[in-house]
Structure formats: structure tokens, C-alpha cells
Amino acid sequence: MAKKGKKYQEAASKVDRTQHYSVEEAIKLAKETSIANFDASVEVAFRLGIDTRKNDQQIRGAVVLPNGTGKSQSVLVFAKGDKIAEAEAAGADYVGEAEYVQKIQQGWFDFDVVVATPDMMGEVGKLGRVLGPKGLMPNPKTGTVTMDVKKAVEEIKAGKVEYRAEKAGIVHASIGKVSFTDEQLIENFNTLQDVLAKAKPSSAKGTYFKSVAVTTTMGPGVKIDTASFK
């Protein structure tokens, strides 16, 4: 542990904690200070000026990042009839009806995202207490409750990420891997930031983008200057 701590301290010493960097500088620095011995994820955290206790200031949705996330997402689709073949053709890893409800109730979780057609939500609803806490419950706001299972699966496989403001108004999301080029990460970041800007509740007052930071898995955080943000 001491060795890991030393590596982190050396990496952290390259980051000026009092400075707010441009998006380009922050992403470059985050990559340079990655200490993981694997292709680490690049994560961002937006602290928004919202009150999540108010229903009209809940922020949740999904966006397809132009360069994907670098992660392979396993997709489970609850569907029936011709929607089963449609989901399979789109690349879904698992497709079915009640049999998967039973498997999940028995502790099976070999998937990352759940999609369901509206007519299956009666069955999927039985899993609310299991899927909800894990953030896996299908939701119309994120496009995971839909009859267009083809589009839903293809977007997830292409690099769609879900975002949701937590209690403190913080949105966490992955925008790629350290192996991505700076340009790919910047483009992904800008896409996510633009979506969050457009999602600003009309009732939110004061500064919206309160603070933003980028980091890699196990690496130090790098603050981003939000002055130019909309």
C-alpha cells in the first residue's frame, strides 16, 4: 500500500490543486498522471447548482458519446414476440421474458444495462428492489423502456452513457479510456457538458456549473475552469 501511496503522491504533485485548467489541459494532465497498470477509465464529475429535493430539478438522461466509452456493455432485453428477434439482431447479449426475472431473483447479474419494452414492465417491475439500488432499472428518461429495442441496443453498444444527478447535485460519468486520444476525450467531454447545459432546470438559480473535475481510475483529480461553460 505504501508503494501505491507514493505513486499517487508523485502523480498528485504534478497537479496544482489551486488551479483550474482548461478542458484540454485538464484531460492531458489527467492522462499523464494516471498510475493504474491497465487502460484506466477517464471519469468526470460535474457539481451542478440544483436542488435534487425538488421534483423539477431532477436531472437524468442518456447520451451517445461520439467516440464511445471504450467499455463493452452487456445488454439484457426484456421483450416478447417479434421484438425478441429484433433485439438479438441488434446485438443484445441476453433476450427473454419471465425466465430472466427468475434468474435475477436468484442472483444472476451478468449484464451492464437492462432494456425493456413497455409491455414487459409489469414483469420487470417485480425486480425494482433488486435492480433499482444498482441503477439497472429500465427508465423511459434514459431510453431503456421503449418499443424501439433495435435503436436502444445499438446506441448502448455504440457508447451510450446514462447520467443522473446525485443528492448533492453531482453527475459522474465515464468519457473514455486513457488510451483514447486527447481529441477523442475532449469531444466526448464537450458532448456531455452540452447535454447537461441543455438539461438545466428553468427553476435553477445562480451558478449552474459549480465545479467540474476530471480524473482517471486511481489517479488524482484535476479541476476544470468552468468560466467558458454555458
From Swiss-Prot:
Domain of life, per lineage: Bacteria
Entry GO terms, CC: large ribosomal subunit
Gene3D superfamilies, alphabetized: 3.30.190.20, 3.40.50.790
Keywords, sorted A to Z: Repressor, Ribonucleoprotein, Ribosomal protein, RNA-binding, rRNA-binding, Translation regulation, tRNA-binding
SUPFAM superfamilies reported for this sequence: Ribosomal protein L1
GO molecular function: rRNA binding; structural constituent of ribosome; tRNA binding
Keyword Ligase in record: no
Biological process per Gene Ontology, one example term: regulation of translation
Entry-linked Pfam families: Ribosomal_L1
InterPro entries the UniProt entry points to: Ribosom_uL1_bac-type (IPR005878), Ribosomal_uL1 (IPR002143), Ribosomal_uL1-like (IPR023674), Ribosomal_uL1/biogenesis (IPR028364), Ribosomal_uL1_3-a/b-sand (IPR016095), Ribosomal_uL1_CS (IPR023673)
PANTHER family: 54S RIBOSOMAL PROTEIN L1, MITOCHONDRIAL, LARGE RIBOSOMAL SUBUNIT PROTEIN UL1M
Annotated family: Belongs to the universal ribosomal protein uL1 family.
HAMAP family recorded: Ribosomal_uL1_B
Purpose of the protein: Binds directly to 23S rRNA. The L1 stalk is quite mobile in the ribosome, and is involved in E site tRNA release. Protein L1 is also a translational repressor protein, it controls the translation of the L11 operon by binding to its mRNA.
Subunit structure: Part of the 50S ribosomal subunit.
Designated name of the protein: Large ribosomal subunit protein uL1
Native source species: Staphylococcus aureus (strain NCTC 8325 / PS 47)
Protein encoded by which gene: rplA
